[in-house]
């Protein structure tokens, strides 16, 4: 029985029974063990041609046997070369090749007796390596049946015998190879091989196995290791090209975490920081405060001409006396109608109480029960007309125990300012929509659309996000009619807006929707990578999988704001 490969002329080769430089399996010394295993498996293994040729000098005599590790022994068990389907539970060719790929160690393309020398030649079977690699295109996206046990990774005994730099800085994690998402019967705990007896496991562990077939050699000027560039994460050709241009052969071990050859699983299983992605996503929402603007818009905001405006029942009160209390506010404004008070820090445990012992931050929100109360309040205010912008500011005089006749600013919100449609017949495409954060309170939807259209062009819609009282929450959405304008806006990221009344830096991100992970297509994808190398949705495990690579580790996640807009 043999593993058929094809030589350069397309003819089948037997890498276990023919004289070659390829390391061979020491089957002759294991014949009795194989017969006992075959008997336990109802003689399902084909031993034709096996153990008929002794390991004579000049063929495979120089190979050293490796019998200290159980994992490689199991992953290189004999299997039938016939075209009949394998017995239930036995590993097939794909499974065995998975084990080969996981062992991408220096010198596996040469006999072990010549690992430390430069004389070892590379294998002459590149087509076999390519075919094996093609079967491993995406272990996460294309479930493959895995019918063998999860054995321990190569241990310290191998590191002591062969202390190569890669071994010293690496650790093979079998879970990354064996974590298939297939629902195949051969994956289940009741499959034939997975539920084998302890005696069978003992037989397997006692096998004397030589090194595996050459696979993905790291030497010889190879520019990159396909395994380490994210097998299973479905990096497309653009990603692979970027990785090939960034990772050099000499620095191939430096581009990965020193604790694991297969990326991400240490990070995934980290008990110290299970919510690191969420924390980074929350920090990104305040990124405008610490990042420089890439472009600036300056000018006049569009004039506002209202006919019978309808207001939100919620108004902003700025510049309130520092010693004001909730009782004092209600007593002052209840002449206009029933109301409640919302203090800053509404996300805390007591949103309707002044923070830190009646020490407000200088502003507060009033929520009236009727829109008519807001109209009455505005009529009682003095107005400062801002002729250059067509805006007017409302001020109301109030007093506290220690401050007499203090003017506070009243900022209402007209409901018509929440949405602006430039082309009513244009269909709004979420994939061409951006999220704009850190908006100034004086920016309405029309002004936002005008600014974004001046900068990037193609704006067909702008909307301001509001809470349950239909009052702005400081963010908005802008939809474009073409992909180029959309990508320009996303690439800009931070834009500074300068007007006669205020200067504000806003933050632009892709608009996020509920989506499945675009890598595994199996789990929800709440995390989005805005970097154009990725630019897709990820589940937690796929995010760690892809972004554990050094060239992608600087990417920051985005998440939809989980805080309900009805929280107030």
Curated annotation (Swiss-Prot):
GO terms for molecular function: metal ion binding; mRNA 3'-UTR AU-rich region binding; mRNA 3'-UTR binding; mRNA regulatory element binding translation repressor activity; ribosome binding; translation factor activity, RNA binding. Signal peptide: none annotated. GO terms for biological process: cellular response to amino acid stimulus; cellular response to hypoxia; cellular response to insulin stimulus; midbrain development; mRNA processing; negative regulation of cytoplasmic translation; neural precursor cell proliferation. Residues 172-175, 182-191 are annotated as: Necessary for interaction with microtubules and localization at the mitotic apparatus. Keywords: Activator, Cytoplasm, Cytoskeleton, Membrane, Metal-binding, mRNA processing, Phosphoprotein, Repeat, Repressor, Ribonucleoprotein, RNA-binding, Translation regulation, Ubl conjugation, Zinc. SMART domains: RRM (SM00360). InterPro entries: CEBP1_N, CEBP_ZZ, CEBP_ZZ_sf, CPEB, CPEB1_RRM1, Nucleotide-bd_a/b_plait_sf, RBD_domain_sf, RRM_dom. GO terms for cellular component: centrosome; cytoplasm; membrane; neuron projection; nucleus; protein-containing complex; ribonucleoprotein complex; spindle pole. Ser-174 phosphorylation by aurka in immature oocytes is essential to trigger CPE-containing mRNA cytoplasmic polyadenylation and translation activation and the subsequent signaling events that result in meiotic progression. Ser-174 phosphorylation recruits the cleavage and polyadenylation specificity factor (cpsf1) into an active cytoplasmic polyadenylation complex. Ser-174 phosphorylation increases its affinity for cpsf1 and papd4/gld2. Heavily phosphorylated by CDK1 on serines late during oocyte maturation. Ser-210 phosphorylation is sufficient to target cpeb1 for degradation. The keyword RNA-binding applies. Residues 179-195 have a biased composition (Low complexity). Expressed uniformly in growing oocytes (stage I to IV) and distributed at the animal pole in fully-grown oocytes (stages V and VI) (at protein level). During early oocyte maturation its expression remains constant and then declines drastically during late oocyte maturation between 4 hours and 6 hours after the germinal vesicle breakdown (GVBD) (at protein level). Expressed during early oogenesis until stage III, remains constant through stage V oocytes, decreases slightly in stage VI oocytes, and then remains constant throughout oocyte maturation. Belongs to the RRM CPEB family. Found in a complex with cpeb1, tacc3/maskin and eif4e; dissolution of this complex results in the binding of eif4e to eif4g and the translational activation of CPE-containing mRNAs. Found in a complex with cpeb1, cpsf1, the cytoplasmic poly(A) polymerase papd4/gld2 and sympk. Found in a mRNP complex with cpeb1, a guanine exchange factor xgef and mos mRNA. Interacts with cpsf1, papd4/gld2, tacc3/maskin, microtubules, sympk and xgef. Component of a ribonucleoprotein (RNP) complex, at least composed of cpeb1, lsm14b/rap55b, ddx6/Xp54, ybx2/frgy2, pat1/P100, eif4enif1/4E-T and eif4e1b. This is Cytoplasmic polyadenylation element-binding protein 1-A. It comes from Xenopus laevis. The gene is cpeb1-a.
């Amino acid at each position: 029985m043999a593993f058929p490969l094809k030589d350069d002329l397309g003819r089948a080769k037997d890498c276990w029974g023919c004289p070659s430089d390829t390391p061979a399996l020491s089957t002759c010394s294991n014949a009795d063990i194989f017969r006992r295993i075959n008997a336990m498996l109802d003689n399902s293994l084909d031993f034709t041609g096996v153990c008929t040729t002794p390991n004579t000098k000049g063929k495979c005599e120089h190979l050293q046997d490796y019998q200290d590790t159980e994992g490689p022994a199991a992953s290189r068990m004999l299997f039938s070369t016939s075209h009949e389907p394998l017995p239930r539970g036995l590993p097939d060719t794909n499974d065995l090749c998975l084990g080969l790929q996981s062992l991408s160690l220096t010198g596996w393309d040469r006999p072990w007796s010549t690992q430390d020398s430069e004389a070892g030649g590379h294998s002459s079977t590149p087509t076999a390596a390519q075919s094996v690699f093609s079967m491993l295109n995406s272990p996460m996206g294309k479930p493959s049946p895995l019918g063998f046990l999860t054995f321990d990774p190569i241990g310290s005994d191998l590191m002591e015998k062969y202390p190569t730099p890669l071994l010293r800085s690496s650790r093979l994690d079998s879970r990354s190879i064996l974590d298939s998402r297939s629902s195949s019967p051969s994956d289940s705990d009741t499959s034939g091989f997975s539920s084998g007896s302890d005696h069978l496991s003992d037989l397997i562990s006692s096998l004397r196995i030589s090194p595996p077939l050459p696979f993905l050699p790291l030497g010889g000027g190879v520019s990159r290791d396909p395994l380490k560039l994210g097998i299973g994460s479905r990096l497309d050709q653009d990603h692979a090209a970027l990785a090939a241009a960034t990772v050099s052969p000499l620095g191939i071990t430096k581009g990965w975490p020193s604790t694991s050859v297969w990326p991400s699983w240490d990070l995934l299983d980290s008990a110290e920081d299970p919510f690191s992605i969420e924390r980074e996503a929350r920090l990104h929402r305040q990124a405008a405060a610490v990042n420089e603007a890439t472009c600036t818009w300056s000018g006049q905001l569009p004039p506002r001409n209202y006919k019978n405006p309808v207001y939100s029942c919620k108004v902003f009160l700025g510049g309130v006396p520092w010693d004001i209390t909730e009782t004092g506010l209600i007593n002052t404004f209840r002449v206009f109608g029933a109301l409640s008070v919302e203090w800053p820090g509404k996300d805390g445990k007591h949103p309707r109480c002044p923070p830190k012992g009646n020490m407000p931050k200088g502003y507060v929100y009033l929520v009236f029960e009727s829109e008519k109360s807001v109209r009455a309040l505005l009529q009682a205010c003095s107005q400062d007309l801002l002729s250059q912008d067509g805006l007017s500011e409302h001020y109301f005089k109030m007093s506290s125990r220690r401050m007499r006749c203090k003017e506070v600013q009243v900022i209402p919100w007209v409901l018509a300012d929440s949405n602006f449609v430039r082309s009513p017949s244009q269909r709004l495409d979420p994939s061409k929509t951006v999220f704009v954060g850190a908006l100034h309170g004086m920016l309405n939807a029309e002004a936002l659309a005008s600014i974004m259209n001046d900068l990037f062009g193609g704006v067909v819609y702008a909307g301001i996000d509001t809470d349950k009282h239909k009052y702005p929450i400081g963010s908005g959405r802008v939809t474009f009619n073409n992909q180029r304008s959309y990508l320009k806006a996303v690439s800009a990221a931070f834009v500074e807006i300068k007007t006669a009344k205020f200067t504000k830096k806003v933050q632009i991100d892709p608009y996020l929707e509920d989506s499945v992970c675009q890598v595994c297509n199996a789990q929800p994808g709440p995390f989005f990578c805005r970097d154009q190398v990725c630019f897709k949705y990820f589940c937690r495990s796929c995010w760690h999988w892809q972004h554990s690579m050094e060239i992608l580790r600087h990417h920051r996640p985005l998440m939809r704001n989980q805080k309900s807009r009805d929280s107030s």
